[in-house]
Amino acid sequence: MFKTKLKKTVGMGIVAAACFISALPASTVSAKERNDYTIESFHYVTVDGKDVDSQINMSNKADKDIKVTMVLPEQNQAGDWLAYGFTSRKSLQAFIEKDKQRLQDKFKITGSGPCCTDFYEYKNKGGQYIYWRDGFKNLPSSWNDRISSLSTASPSSSYSTTLWEHTSTQGYGKGVLFRHSDWYGKTANMASDWDNKASAIEIK
């Protein structure tokens, strides 16, 4: 089901619900403490499952090779979002299959609870919005390059939400992924790199 609903733009604080968050280095700063979930720059913790030396900045080439970024709801002291990088959809899928097994005892996919991810035209869940429950969807022209924030489905309903910069016929391009066990109850705002840039969405 793919529908658009009207919603008044409301200035609102971002409230973070208590969700499962993986253990992260002590040097990180909670996004909840910052009270800001604007997705901008990334600090890659792993790439294709391999640890990245935190003392060494990734080369520009390595950064360009990353096709999908899984954003974690934690930032380092510089304000960069901690993230897992993947150089292909195949490497991402391999991670997801293992991660689902790890999470299955915590969040059983039952289809209960909030079923869908909501996508909004403005930051902080403002303006019109659409919602999507499952699978891949090329956005219609009315929503192409229009998404500015999102609120994920429950982790008991599905695993993740991905924004793709291109449609499937255009090769997908880069993607930014939000794991529902991390982001449920939070509002992710897109900064310049992803604000009004998505041409397709995917719920797994």
What are these regions (language model features)?
Residues A31-K204:
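Compact beta-sheet-dominated domain cores in extracellular/mature segments
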Residues F2-V29:
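Sec-dependent N-terminal signal peptides of Gram-positive bacterial secreted proteins and lipoproteins
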